[in-house]
Amino acid sequence: MFASKLAVCSALALLAVAHAAPGGNDIQKITKAPNVPTKAEGDAASKASAPAIPPKPVNERFPHAVLFGGTCGGTIISPTWILTAGHCTLFTGGRYILAGTNNTDNPNAVTRHVKRQVIHPLFSVGPYWLDADDFNIKQVAARWDFLLAELSEPLPLDGKLMAAAKLDDQPSLPVGLNVGFGGYGTDHFGGTMRSEMHGMELAVQSDEVCSTLEQYNSKDMLCVKGRPPRFDSACNGDSGSGLVDETGRVIGVASWVENDAHSCFNGALVVFSRVASVRDWIKKVTNI
């Protein structure tokens, strides 16, 4: 996700029961058959009185998500490989990743250095260096926005705090598919990265809807939109984050957002680079 001016180096553009008391008279003469709750009513009562299960921390919902280079997200696809966005190399060297945590200040987080980066051979990006107002630019898009980063040593994957996402290989996805991502991007346009990982809930949109964005190309892109009631989106610093379905399969890499040269807003269309379109390239580079 890109901002309107080059000076925004620190944040990449892209690309949140009461149980009923008995009556006052506990001893009553029964003059008619008591009301026996139905099974459905009994189940409902049991659920109402059961203690609420607290939601999982965001990093346990997205154990494959990492902080890449301090200004982007990324996805663990093996103990030694991270998948992120090619444009994340424009403003940062991407020399390290942070994994296994919900907070960048956590001393128990796992850090690994990046020893090699491989950018997709067809990667290209729009004119992010131009003033968006002067040139009437709505959003800056990227094509084939993929980067593979090889780590200096393996991550200790445990399946709970750190896990490798499965790679999508499906040529098409059902419209309305529930998907999401975890990242550290800013909560407003031009802001700074957040220390707490946030989780976003979205749904896959049709190519017809996505094509309202003139730079959209279904060959290497897919787009999503936030689900109600929050209508989540993405903002500066969410670039590179992995879009996953409910089975933990990574289907996209966060690339750019509707009107991202000017603003971040709930309900915006978010464009991800389509992982299935580069499945063979990933295998060639990583043997995964």
Curated annotation (Swiss-Prot):
Disulfide bonds join 72-88, 210-223, 235-264. Residues 1-20 form the signal peptide. Residues 21-287 form the Peptidase S1 domain. Residues 27-56 are annotated as: Disordered. GO terms for biological process: proteolysis. It is an enzyme of class 3 (hydrolase). One of its GO terms (molecular function) is serine-type endopeptidase activity. It holds the Pfam family Trypsin. Its EC number is 3.4.21.-. The active site is at 87 (charge relay system), 145 (charge relay system), 239 (charge relay system). Keywords: Disulfide bond, Hydrolase, Protease, Serine protease, Signal. InterPro entries: CLIP_Serine_Protease (IPR051333), Peptidase_S1_PA (IPR009003), Peptidase_S1_PA_chymotrypsin (IPR043504), Peptidase_S1A (IPR001314), Trypsin_dom (IPR001254), TRYPSIN_HIS (IPR018114). SUPFAM superfamilies: Trypsin-like serine proteases. Belongs to the peptidase S1 family. This is Scolexin B.
